[in-house]
Amino acid sequence: MSSIFINKGVEMMESEKSGGMDRYVTFERIDCFKNAHEVVSNALRVLEANPEMKNPFWEKFCSKIPDSFYSYTPQEDLLYLVCANVFYLEELFDEAEDEEGQAIMSRCEFECC
């Protein structure tokens, strides 16, 4: 076995011991629903502020936002929607030059997708 894999395992265990979050060890302290909710909230904000960015894709995306988003009831379907559309969401935030959306999308993708 390569020392690279062993070193990564040691790093992951040390991260866990120090209280750091590492999705490869556990999702225990990562609120993926909150992350996904923030991504969708920011996407809706960007689309509202930039009506010229709306197109049939975003209309369809908005129609697929589950009820759990609006009721803030943690369910996996919201995370699935975000993770299945990472590329498009990143592009939306990039085109809008929305740093907050970019940061939240990056965090959600890294921690949860």
Curated annotation (Swiss-Prot):
<dbReference type="Pfam" id="PF20543">
    <property type="entry name" value="CowN"/>
</dbReference>
<comment type="function">
    <text>Is required to sustain N(2)-dependent growth in the presence of low levels of carbon monoxide (CO). Probably acts by protecting the N(2) fixation ability of the nitrogenase complex, which is inactivated in the presence of CO.</text>
</comment>
<comment type="similarity">
    <text>Belongs to the CowN family.</text>
</comment>
<dbReference type="InterPro" id="IPR024899">
    <property type="entry name" value="CowN"/>
</dbReference>
<protein>
    <recommendedName>
        <fullName>N(2)-fixation sustaining protein CowN</fullName>
    </recommendedName>
</protein>
<keyword id="KW-0535">Nitrogen fixation</keyword>
<dbReference type="GO" id="GO:0009399">
    <property type="term" value="P:nitrogen fixation"/>
</dbReference>
